[in-house]
Amino acid sequence: MEDFLRQLKDAAYDLSPLDIIPNHLYLTNVFFFENDTPDRDSPFMPHEALVASLYDSLQSFPILVGCLQPGVTTTKLVVDADNPNLPSWETHNVPDVHFGRVKTRGFHRESWPECINITDPLVHAEDGAASPKLLRVRVCRFAGNSGVAVVVRLAHCVFDAKGCTFFLNYWATCCRNRLKPGSTEAATPSPPILDRSVMYACLPPSVRPKPLGWLLLPLSLVLTTLVRVVMFFVGKKTSTGTSRALLFCVPRRTLDEVTKHDGQDKKSRLSDNDVVTALFTMAYAQMRQAASNGKMPRKVTAIVPCDFRHRLGVPQNFTGSCAVGLYVTAPLALLLQHITPSSLSEVAAISRRSVDEVDIKVIERFSKRAMLAIQLLGDKARDLYSLMVCQAFSNQSRLPFYDVDFGFGRPLFVSPMAYSKSLAVIVPPPPPSRDVYVYLTLEVEAMAHMLRNEGFMAMVKRVY
């Protein structure tokens, strides 16, 4: 830590509108590592190596020791070298839970120690601190030195999901290098790009942030006040309500069966993501139809993120939010059909067309919309998103969560935790499986209705 503090300098990072909208949330993941070495006396994944390598990695990620500094319609992350916002670190020893027991139960959430069972997605300061931690780490050590679970919570305003895995693998590489100093196996990870101006350089000038003109300031104040009033009366409908989260597996056979019914041009085949989007959107629409006593709009919209790094040439090591939310809209009559491979294929085709149509103009349009919302409402713009009655998705299925190796082997199981309700997070399965996992968070009653949907349940398996 001392080396990190010596080289730390004051800095300020202007967040983009894409960062500001989710700035009230953490990205949370838990990693399960098994100690399968014969020598059970040596500490597995020793505390000193994990902490020291974390601070090694922070030399390239000083943004993580910054403090949120909101303006009227802007937000910055400010690093104070004399008073950094250092990560929180907790260690829990669990003498009554053996890693083997959790593994035998397929990492079912009911088998987890209570210390890693986190449900709150919100960023907030604790213990009277002036600013919330941007990075929280919690380590659970199982009985008999049998394994370790590592929970990492990263503020969403700092990273998107891709930036999150970039940081996690960077930290893991630093740990491996520290364990074998001078080894030919030592790797030099590519440095991250934290400056949001790198993303703006790939976007049209019209999309780049502009200061709010003084003529618009009164309008901004009025709109912000109106949003506060609306949220006061309908707060129970927002992302902070009572929710339940389950992890589903969409088997490979289900995915393949749906794509067999695909009648589209073979140049644009349905992806796994299209099928998953269709499946959970149909189930969500059917749940909403039952809850609304038939009072539903003729069309239902799902929000599907589209990472535009590769489309616009934004460097892959850019770690800030770099995705726009596409609106995939399908007729209600189609969504209310019984869920079968054939009906799923029809809805999935709509998702595929929406993604295929993404180009610079689409990205520019959505970015401008986010920019205007932030200009006028600041971080209150997120409240408007929380009021949307639609299924939202986060596609993380291709991200290298299972490559995170601190020098003691890769994780046997990785799971997201603590997400907002009405969000379906698509994540990779444990290797070598080719299934797709989906972590779904809904209101308690809504989830109960989903579980009673026979068509939906025929297409999935519950992991927990």
Regions found by a protein language model. Give the residues of each.
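Non-catalytic N-terminal regions of enzymes
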Residues: 1-210, 242, 256-263, 270-293, ...
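Short, compositionally biased low-complexity segments
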Residues: 18-28, 223-236, 317-327
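Active-site rim elements
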Residues: 37, 41, 266, 334-341
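Flexible, P/S/T/G-rich "lid" or insertion loops adjacent to the active sites of thioester-utilizing
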Residues: 205-268
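Short acidic alpha-helical/loop segments enriched in Asp/Glu that coordinate divalent cations
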Residues: 290-302, 360-371
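Divalent metal-binding acidic/histidine catalytic loops
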Residues: 311-318, 330
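Helical lid/core segments from catalytic subdomains that handle acyl or acyl-like groups
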Residues: 321-404
